[in-house]
Swiss-Prot record:
Gene: cbiT
Assigned EC number: 2.1.1.196
A Gene Ontology biological process term: methylation
Protein name, UniProt field: Probable cobalt-precorrin-6B C(15)-methyltransferase (decarboxylating)
Assigned protein family: Belongs to the methyltransferase superfamily. Archaeal-type CbiT family.
Pfam entry (one): Methyltransf_31
Chain residues that bind S-adenosyl-L-methionine: 24, 48-52, 72, 101
Length: 199
């Protein structure tokens, strides 16, 4: 499948899905990718790649001169990300690694320009600490979080480690759903997008 547009936000239904594997939804994904400020040729790390929606879109943004690493502890997620990367024709500049963060991050022999941390890991502080070690100076980290505890732990860890220009945005998306009498707006869970830079 070809995505002909230069902006992120591929519709969710374009991706192969699995109910057991989480997905960063299209509106949240578009905002998170904009907060990453990806450039052509960047090295990107997607921690907790899930369905691969962020991995695929980041790959489209970095182009053939960049590379995106997708990491997930679930074999099903790695396989699903691979299938979605194949579907969008970007498998050539994606590296998939099965393993649990933060431990697996120290086995990757790369430094990254941008790191995306998806989901709500209980090890968010340790993952942020590991990210500091493998991100280049001037690099950006973006975290999606659902739980307030994750937000609190992430902000605290980023401040203590030395990330600068911290920003937190709460996003509430409502999608229209047809009913018998009209269209109702169905609200999704609020998502927090946290970003910071290593200077």
């Amino acid at each position: 499948m070809e995505w002909k547009y230069v902006i992120p936000g591929i519709p969710d239904n374009f991706f192969e899905r699995d109910e057991e594997i989480p997905m960063t939804k299209e509106e949240i994904r578009a905002l998170a990718l904009s907060k990453l400020r990806i450039r052509k040729g960047d090295m990107i790390l997607d921690i907790g790649c899930g369905t691969g929606s962020v991995t695929v879109e980041a790959s489209l943004l970095v182009g053939s001169t960049g590379k995106v690493y997708g990491v997930d502890k679930e074999e099903k997620a790695i396989n699903l990300t691979r299938r979605n990367a194949e579907k969008f024709g970007v498998l050539n500049n994606i590296v998939l690694i099965k393993g649990e963060a933060p431990e697996i991050l120290f086995t990757i022999n790369e430094k990254f320009d941008r790191i995306f941390i998806g989901g709500g890991s209980e090890k968010i502080k340790e993952i942020i600490s590991a990210s500091w070690e493998i991100i280049k100076k001037g690099g950006r980290v973006v975290i999606d979080a659902i739980l307030l505890e994750t937000v609190n732990n992430a902000i605290s860890a980023m401040e203590n480690i030395g990330f600068m220009n911290l920003e937190i945005t709460e996003v509430i998306i409502a999608k229209g759903m047809k009913t018998k009498v009209g269209t109702a707006m169905m609200t999704r869970n609020p998502i927090f997008i946290i970003s910071g830079e290593k200077q």
